[in-house]
């Protein structure tokens, strides 16, 4: 049974009914509509913490979806799951794929930076300062791009860039 038929929450049910109606009325092909249903069910499963089901739905959506913006959004959600599951290398790879599809996703860059910064802290704690600096530089590169795409949207990151001396962003709000 599709996840959309299992929603117990009134708001979820209402959203699902409205989304189904909109999808039926939109002048898009059946393949794109089916991709959207898989994406929506993946998002619902992800919100419920059922990551395996979410990934299955996202995989199906990717097989059907041709729109790069929608593919990028689907890949971003998959990367978030990998990141939550501790599969950080896979998350980085998937964030990069998402950015290849749609480069205007600052949250992908922000999350990549979080992983790089974490790896830098671990290397620093282990006394591997050269590795730490390399990871911190990669975090700064990803975060600088994120801040440029979303000025003022990541104040904590902007502060980190400034306080570590890694800031080369010329626009702060």
From Swiss-Prot:
Topology in membrane: Peripheral membrane protein
> Primary place of residence?
membrane
Short name of one Pfam family: TPR_12
UniProt keyword annotation of Thylakoid present? yes
SMART domains registered for this protein in UniProt: TPR
Location relative to the cell: Cellular thylakoid membrane
Q: Which SUPFAM superfamilies match?
A: TPR-like
Report which superkingdom the organism of origin falls in: Bacteria
Arranged from A to Z, the UniProt key words for this protein are: Membrane, Photosynthesis, Repeat, Thylakoid, TPR repeat
**Which residue ranges contain the repeat TPR?**
35-68, 72-105, 120-153
Biological process terms in GO annotation = photosynthesis
Classification via InterPro entries: PSI_Ycf3_assembly, TPR-like_helical_dom_sf, TPR_rpt, Ycf3/AcsC/BcsC/TPR_MFPF
| Keyword Metal-binding included in the entry's annotation | no
Q: Which GO terms describe its cellular component?
A: plasma membrane-derived thylakoid membrane
Q: What does this protein do?
A: Essential for the assembly of the photosystem I (PSI) complex. May act as a chaperone-like factor to guide the assembly of the PSI subunits.
- Family of this protein: Belongs to the Ycf3 family.
Protein name, as recorded? Photosystem I assembly protein Ycf3
């Amino acid at each position: 049974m599709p996840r959309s038929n299992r929603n117990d929450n009134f708001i979820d049910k209402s959203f699902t009914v409205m989304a189904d109606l909109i999808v039926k009325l939109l002048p898009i092909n059946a393949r794109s509509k089916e991709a959207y249903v898989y994406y929506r069910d993946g998002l619902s499963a992800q919100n419920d913490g059922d990551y395996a089901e979410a990934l299955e739905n996202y995989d199906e959506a990717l097989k059907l979806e041709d729109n790069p913006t929608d593919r990028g959004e689907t890949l971003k959600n998959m990367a978030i799951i990998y990141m939550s599951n501790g599969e950080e290398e896979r998350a980085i790879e998937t964030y990069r794929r998402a950015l290849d599809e749609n480069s205007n996703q600052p949250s992908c860059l922000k999350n990549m930076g979080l992983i790089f910064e974490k790896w830098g802290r671990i290397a620093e704690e282990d006394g591997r300062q050269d590795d730490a600096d390399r990871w911190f530089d990669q975090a700064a590169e990803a975060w600088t791009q994120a801040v440029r795409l979303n000025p003022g949207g990541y104040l904590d990151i902007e502060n980190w860039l400034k306080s570590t001396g890694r800031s080369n962003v010329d626009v702060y709000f």
